[in-house]
Amino acid sequence: MSVTLDLQLASASTDGLPSEAQLQGWLDGTILGFQQEAEVTVRIVDEAESNELNLTYRGKDKPTNVLSFPFEAPPGLELPLLGDLVICRQVVEREAAEQGKPLMAHWAHMVVHGSLHLLGYDHIEDDEAEEMETLERDIMQELGFADPYLNDEE
């Protein structure tokens, strides 16, 4: 059982970023509960790249915390490629500060949240959002972090 991490650092600054070992642990803690083998690219970017990707793929002209790009293999081709996560350093840092959350807890949450999208979970409909948020809470707790939605419910 393993998750292969391909880490790409495309941010001008690497100060305050999680270590490769932390990212690996968060991916393992999320994905191995669903499948035995996977390969995930995590690309940490600045706001300009996040904004460009968010506009191109979601039609939203602003940077966002995490974008998930699931890999869709052609029929009959079995590969462990799960997909790519693109995480914007500045947005994660800003959100953590605004929400009063520890920075590493918010990084972990973005990896968990994005990984669940790669696994096919979504939050467009209310029932889907509830299921996904429950999984996020459970996984974050297993990883040793507080409920990431606690402040949202106050």
Curated annotation (Swiss-Prot):
EC numbers for this chain: 3.1.-.-
Cofactor binding note from Swiss-Prot or TrEMBL: Binds 1 zinc ion.
Gene Ontology CC annotations of this record: cytoplasm
UniProt-annotated binding residues for Zn(2+): 113, 117, 123
Single GO MF annotation: zinc ion binding
Free-text function comment from the UniProt entry: Single strand-specific metallo-endoribonuclease involved in late-stage 70S ribosome quality control and in maturation of the 3' terminus of the 16S rRNA.
Keywords (A to Z) from UniProt: Cytoplasm, Endonuclease, Hydrolase, Metal-binding, Nuclease, Ribosome biogenesis, rRNA processing, Zinc
Localization terms from the record: Cytoplasm
Main location: cytoplasm
Cross-referenced InterPro entries: MetalPrtase_cat_dom_sf_prd, YbeY, YbeY_CS
Cofactor(s) demanded: Zn(2+)
PROSITE patterns: UPF0054
Biological-process GO terms, alphabetical: rRNA processing
Family: Belongs to the endoribonuclease YbeY family.
Enzyme kind, highest EC tier: hydrolase
Protein name per Swiss-Prot or TrEMBL: Endoribonuclease YbeY
